[in-house]
């Protein structure tokens, strides 16, 4: 199922189906699009877009925030090779009109030549999302009810997972079939660092927000496979970077949309991938914040 929006400029070559292109689909994979810096990525989460662009929640206009981020991404001095949005695309319950609005707001980045990789969160609705993008559906039915993807880059492979249980059900779960797919995919791709992207955070008593229910089962897969270097997540509407007991990097993306607690930033993260780690730069919507431009230099475990 679709997790990938191609650059608009390439659509004339696709002819209604992405199956023959660099589609990232359920159980499938794709290479990064050509760009001046293939290791440069824009990482977003929790955009929470409503059909009505004037919708405000927690004193935040989500449409305005995403527009601001998109403008900054396309103007980035080292052009990014791709965009990852790590779940909670829709405002509340994933209405069809929400996804139509999201496509419109993402269009400037796609017209700039950027592919956009999408994960789903607990505020999303799979069937409504797929209905909005009928021509993007893949014929690959290896995981027909989930959105999983392998995205290859020169220095690392992204494994994008789907933790949505049901719309408006706050916790997340991967399930047996998806974890089995991930195990096979990781074992078949040990040549580069593996980076896990999933909307829900690990259940490690980080915050008082329902987490990924099968955290323990996922960590049993990730921790012993030393080529797995990091777990990137959203959901908590917080920004943090730390390591677990095995040396696995745990990166919590800030929300593009609203905050759950005062003092946290909203914005996005610019990532520069290396063979031995990654440089993460926090890009706050409020450029006056002290942590705007904060850099975290990650070094992968060995």
Cite the ranges covered by each PLM segment.
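Short acidic, glycine-rich surface-loop motifs adjacent to enzyme active sites
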Residues: 189-206
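N-terminal export leaders
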Residues: 9-26
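Extended active-site neighborhood of metal-dependent phosphoesterases/phosphodiesterases
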Residues: 95-184, 188, 193, 214-227, ...
